[in-house]
């Protein structure tokens, strides 16, 4: 069976602002199945941003579990992420899920992987997905050499990734927190 490919998710934090954005392309083999998928969401009463890459069904399953962990830990992003990663790593069914998440609240940005990793990215920039390396490189260059707002850095980084990665389009959803 062919694998779904695609997605670029990038987050930039500067000062008291954080932006998280993603493209809208879902690809099956060499066919674009959808160009307007929404892979970035606000959860926990709009206080937490989350973006996902990987298998869509797996990502939604993890998103539901992550929301439950946020409720359990009263919005403590780090505790919720670590608990989700522990479950993801130790549960046989969850271990098969193929997705990654970037989560952000007013204070913290974390990357959560299926390997049980919870990573606090250096420099306030994180990116995942097929175009993640392009977006992260562009975001890093822009953040270090301009005074652009995080939302603008995310938009430009996604644009560059969309120009270089065949699994990334230029239909973006970008959310911000201040």
From Swiss-Prot:
A double ring-shaped homohexamer of HslV is capped on each side by a ring-shaped HslU homohexamer. The assembly of the HslU/HslV complex is dependent on binding of ATP. It is found in: Cytoplasm. This is ATP-dependent protease subunit HslV. The gene is hslV. Gene3D superfamilies: Glutamine Phosphoribosylpyrophosphate, subunit 1, domain 1. Allosterically activated by HslU binding. Its main location: cytoplasm. Protease subunit of a proteasome-like degradation complex believed to be a general protein degrading machinery. GO terms for biological process: proteolysis involved in protein catabolic process. It catalyses: ATP-dependent cleavage of peptide bonds with broad specificity. The keyword Zinc-finger does not apply. GO terms for molecular function: metal ion binding; threonine-type endopeptidase activity. It comes from Cupriavidus necator (strain ATCC 17699 / DSM 428 / KCTC 22496 / NCIMB 10442 / H16 / Stanier 337) (Ralstonia eutropha). The keyword Cell inner membrane does not apply. Transmembrane segments: none annotated. It is an enzyme of class 3 (hydrolase). CDD domains: protease_HslV (cd01913). One of its GO terms (cellular component) is HslUV protease complex.
């Amino acid at each position: 069976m062919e694998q779904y490919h695609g997605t670029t998710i990038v987050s930039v934090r500067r000062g008291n602002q954080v932006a998280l954005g993603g493209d809208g392309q879902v690809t099956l083999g060499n066919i674009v199945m959808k160009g307007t998928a929404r892979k970035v969401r606000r959860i926990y009463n709009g206080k937490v941003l989350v973006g996902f890459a990987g298998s869509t069904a797996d990502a939604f399953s993890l998103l539901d579990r992550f929301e439950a962990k946020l409720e359990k830990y009263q919005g403590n992003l780090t505790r919720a992420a670590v608990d989700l990663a522990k479950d993801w790593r130790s549960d046989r069914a969850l271990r098969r899920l193929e997705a990654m998440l970037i989560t952000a609240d007013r204070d913290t940005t974390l990357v959560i992987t299926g390997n049980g990793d919870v990573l606090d990215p250096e420099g306030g920039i994180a990116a995942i997905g097929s175009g993640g390396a392009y977006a992260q490189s562009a975001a890093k260059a822009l953040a270090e050499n301009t005074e652009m707002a995080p939302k603008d850095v995310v938009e430009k980084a996604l644009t560059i990734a969309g120009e270089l990665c065949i699994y990334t389009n230029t239909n973006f959803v970008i959310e911000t927190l201040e």
